[in-house]
Design a protein with these regions (language model features):
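Conserved catalytic-core segment of NTP-binding enzymes
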Residues: 1-79
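Short, basic, low-complexity termini and linkers enriched in Ser/Thr/Gly/Pro
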Residues: 122-126
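Short, contiguous clusters of charged residues that form electrostatic/catalytic patches at enzyme active sites
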Residues: 25, 29, 105-112
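C-terminal boundary of histidine-terminating zinc-finger modules
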Residues: 88-109
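Short, glycine-rich, amphipathic interfacial segments at transmembrane boundaries or analogous
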Residues: 80-88
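C-terminal alpha-helix
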Residues: 109-121
Length: 126
């Protein structure tokens, strides 16, 4: 909870599994408590779907998250990728371990989406 007290915003990764949705409700409750008491400026940056595979279950979870959270759900998803798992064992971030890996491309796409959202938010606040 300390980190949420000091943060401006939080990016919430959501594993594309149903049990993750249960944990998500607990996290959202914690964020609400922090926002109502210790840090009223805390915002949710967005919900990032992770460990995504193209199967029915993952598609259902992704659809639920997008329907429930709307524009707060990032368009970018982080696909399950072996290179993402290998990179830490080599002491490297995935971008340095294998820049062409699906996971690297996904994270680069996420970075671009974040920048685009923040530029848009900055314009709207002026």
């Amino acid at each position: 909870m300390n980190i949420l007290t000091a943060a401006d915003s939080v990016l919430i990764p959501v594993q594309c599994e149903y049990l993750a949705l249960e944990g998500l409700s607990k996290l959202l409750n914690t964020i609400k408590i922090v926002k109502n008491g210790l840090n009223p400026d805390l915002d949710i940056e967005g919900f990032l779907l992770t460990m995504y595979m193209r199967n029915r279950l993952n598609n259902q979870v992704a659809t639920e998250v997008r329907q429930h959270f709307g524009e707060l759900a990032f368009d970018t998803v982080i696909q399950r990728n072996i290179r993402l798992g290998e990179a830490p064992s080599h002491g490297k971030p995935v971008m340095l371990y294998d820049a062409s890996a699906t996971g690297s491309v996904n994270y680069l796409t996420l970075a671009k989406e974040l920048l685009k959202r923040n530029r848009k938010a900055t314009k709207n606040n002026k």
